[in-house]
Amino acid sequence: MTDNELEELFPQFACIADGSLRQKAQRAMRLAAQRGGWDWESILKCPVTLNWTECPVTWVEHVRDVTDACIQAFAQQEKYFRQNHVPVSRDLVVAGALLHDIGKLTEFAHVDN
Protein backbone atom coordinates (compact mmCIF):
# COMPACT_ATOMS: atom_id res chain seq x y z
CA MET A 1 0.00 0.00 0.00
CA THR A 2 1.40 3.39 -0.99
CA ASP A 3 1.38 6.61 1.00
CA ASN A 4 -1.13 8.02 -1.50
CA GLU A 5 -3.45 5.07 -0.88
CA LEU A 6 -3.08 5.50 2.88
CA GLU A 7 -3.89 9.20 2.55
CA GLU A 8 -6.96 8.32 0.51
CA LEU A 9 -8.09 5.86 3.19
CA PHE A 10 -7.19 8.23 6.00
CA PRO A 11 -7.25 11.90 4.93
CA GLN A 12 -6.34 12.76 8.53
CA PHE A 13 -2.70 11.99 7.70
CA ALA A 14 -2.69 15.42 6.04
CA CYS A 15 -3.43 16.95 9.47
CA ILE A 16 0.06 15.97 10.66
CA ALA A 17 2.13 19.06 9.88
CA ASP A 18 5.47 17.45 10.79
CA GLY A 19 6.44 15.67 7.58
CA SER A 20 8.85 13.33 9.35
CA LEU A 21 6.22 12.23 11.86
CA ARG A 22 3.64 11.81 9.08
CA GLN A 23 6.03 9.58 7.10
CA LYS A 24 6.84 7.49 10.19
CA ALA A 25 3.15 7.03 10.99
CA GLN A 26 2.40 6.04 7.39
CA ARG A 27 5.31 3.62 7.39
CA ALA A 28 4.10 1.98 10.61
CA MET A 29 0.61 1.52 9.19
CA ARG A 30 1.94 0.29 5.85
CA LEU A 31 4.22 -2.27 7.55
CA ALA A 32 1.41 -3.54 9.78
CA ALA A 33 -0.86 -3.94 6.74
CA GLN A 34 1.86 -5.76 4.79
CA ARG A 35 2.69 -8.08 7.67
CA GLY A 36 -0.98 -8.89 8.13
CA GLY A 37 -1.52 -9.54 4.43
CA TRP A 38 -3.91 -6.63 3.94
CA ASP A 39 -4.03 -4.81 0.61
CA TRP A 40 -6.04 -1.86 -0.69
CA GLU A 41 -9.21 -3.89 -1.28
CA SER A 42 -9.09 -6.21 1.71
CA ILE A 43 -8.32 -3.54 4.30
CA LEU A 44 -11.69 -1.96 3.54
CA LYS A 45 -13.26 -5.18 4.87
CA CYS A 46 -11.06 -5.53 7.95
CA PRO A 47 -13.33 -5.90 10.99
CA VAL A 48 -13.04 -3.61 13.95
CA THR A 49 -13.70 -6.53 16.29
CA LEU A 50 -14.01 -10.29 16.16
CA ASN A 51 -16.39 -10.41 19.12
CA TRP A 52 -19.31 -8.85 17.24
CA THR A 53 -19.69 -10.83 14.04
CA GLU A 54 -22.30 -8.58 12.45
CA CYS A 55 -20.68 -5.30 13.46
CA PRO A 56 -21.53 -2.77 10.74
CA VAL A 57 -18.38 -0.71 11.36
CA THR A 58 -15.09 -1.62 9.67
CA TRP A 59 -11.61 -1.09 11.06
CA VAL A 60 -11.03 1.77 8.60
CA GLU A 61 -14.24 3.53 9.64
CA HIS A 62 -13.39 3.06 13.31
CA VAL A 63 -9.89 4.53 12.92
CA ARG A 64 -11.26 7.49 10.94
CA ASP A 65 -13.95 8.16 13.56
CA VAL A 66 -11.57 7.88 16.52
CA THR A 67 -9.07 10.17 14.79
CA ASP A 68 -11.75 12.76 14.01
CA ALA A 69 -12.95 12.61 17.63
CA CYS A 70 -9.39 13.16 18.88
CA ILE A 71 -8.89 16.11 16.53
CA GLN A 72 -12.13 17.69 17.79
CA ALA A 73 -11.27 17.01 21.43
CA PHE A 74 -7.81 18.53 20.94
CA ALA A 75 -9.35 21.66 19.43
CA GLN A 76 -11.63 22.03 22.45
CA GLN A 77 -9.01 21.26 25.09
CA GLU A 78 -5.87 22.86 23.67
CA LYS A 79 -6.53 26.20 25.39
CA TYR A 80 -6.45 24.54 28.81
CA PHE A 81 -3.11 22.91 28.11
CA ARG A 82 -1.68 26.21 26.86
CA GLN A 83 -3.11 28.19 29.82
CA ASN A 84 -1.37 25.81 32.20
CA HIS A 85 1.85 25.64 30.18
CA VAL A 86 1.43 21.93 29.49
CA PRO A 87 3.29 20.98 26.31
CA VAL A 88 0.96 19.31 23.85
CA SER A 89 1.34 18.38 20.20
CA ARG A 90 -1.61 18.15 17.83
CA ASP A 91 0.59 16.15 15.45
CA LEU A 92 1.24 13.51 18.11
CA VAL A 93 -2.45 13.33 18.98
CA VAL A 94 -3.39 12.77 15.33
CA ALA A 95 -0.61 10.24 14.73
CA GLY A 96 -1.51 8.37 17.90
CA ALA A 97 -5.17 8.25 16.95
CA LEU A 98 -4.37 6.96 13.46
CA LEU A 99 -2.12 4.25 14.87
CA HIS A 100 -4.09 3.32 18.00
CA ASP A 101 -5.39 0.07 16.50
CA ILE A 102 -2.75 -1.00 13.96
CA GLY A 103 -2.10 -4.14 15.98
CA LYS A 104 -5.36 -5.52 14.63
CA LEU A 105 -3.82 -5.59 11.16
CA THR A 106 -1.36 -8.21 12.35
CA GLU A 107 -3.63 -9.95 14.87
CA PHE A 108 -6.59 -10.50 12.54
CA ALA A 109 -6.09 -12.92 9.66
CA HIS A 110 -7.41 -11.78 6.31
CA VAL A 111 -9.76 -14.41 4.91
CA ASP A 112 -11.24 -14.16 1.42
CA ASN A 113 -15.01 -14.61 1.46
Regions found by a protein language model. Name each.
Residues 1-113:
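Acidic/His-rich, divalent-metal-binding segments that scaffold phosphate/diphosphate chemistry
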